[in-house]
């Protein structure tokens, strides 16, 4: 499938979710850590969280990671004023290895506002574009290729397991029948229309769009998001100094359950937020995306 044009990096100027809560947590660290410590921003995106941290802590340095070329471009432009205090690396956090210990590892999971708002990326069912959904448009198979190659059974299982969609069998059957009879879908809205047709009319206009869970499942599969998260949860504690913070922000239950379980069972970590931190009503009003966010924080234990 041909890729659509990639938009300007300026669209990454979104509001970082729960920025105040992250800064507040960092300020609770011992001052000797925040005076000259290193932070690993595992999902730098447009650089919003990193910019806030660098502005609030003049002695801190950040290594920022991202696999999206447009995010790298946007973050580099936004953070250039911080000079050598910021280093940006083009990589998936699952592939990152590091030896210098950090005072914090921060991960803001999932798809960004920019990626949702840019039709050419193919993440949105509201804006028509190619059925792509790759975080890195230059690597791996697109969502269109995925639905083409999977069997109906495997597609149904994927939609059920990664999207928690109860109508997964009906949706998979519809998609595979359409592909067999009419060839590839013309774009994301064409696919979304087919998915919506698997729901009773009264359920097509509810609070949650009929395509939400299926699009989520395809995006997670295309980018191996849960596999990458499992890798991060395993490796990140080794990057931390004693008392260093591991902060993970998730936007759906599949991610949050894994983060919660890992923090609870990992003997390298002490859970600091027994319940997830949620965005304030004021933030949700300004930034509706923050409503589904859950921030969990743990600290590196001293291991003898």
UniProtKB/Swiss-Prot annotation:
- Name of protein: Ribosomal RNA small subunit methyltransferase H
Q: Which UniProt keywords apply?
A: Cytoplasm, Methyltransferase, rRNA processing, S-adenosyl-L-methionine, Transferase
SUPFAM superfamilies the UniProt entry points to: Putative methyltransferase TM0872, insert domain, S-adenosyl-L-methionine-dependent methyltransferases
Q: Which InterPro entries match?
A: RsmH, SAM-dep_MeTrfase_MraW_recog, SAM-dependent_MTases_sf
Annotated binding of S-adenosyl-L-methionine, by residue? 47-49, 66, 93, 108, 115
* E.C. code: 2.1.1.199
Q: Which organism is it from?
A: Prochlorococcus marinus (strain NATL2A)
Tell me where in or outside the cell this protein is found: Cytoplasm
Q: Name one GO cellular component term.
A: cytoplasm
Q: Give the record's family classification.
A: Belongs to the methyltransferase superfamily. RsmH family.
Q: Which reaction does it catalyse?
A: cytidine(1402) in 16S rRNA + S-adenosyl-L-methionine = N(4)-methylcytidine(1402) in 16S rRNA + S-adenosyl-L-homocysteine + H(+)
A GO BP entry is: rRNA base methylation
User: CDD domains attached here?
Assistant: AdoMet_MTases
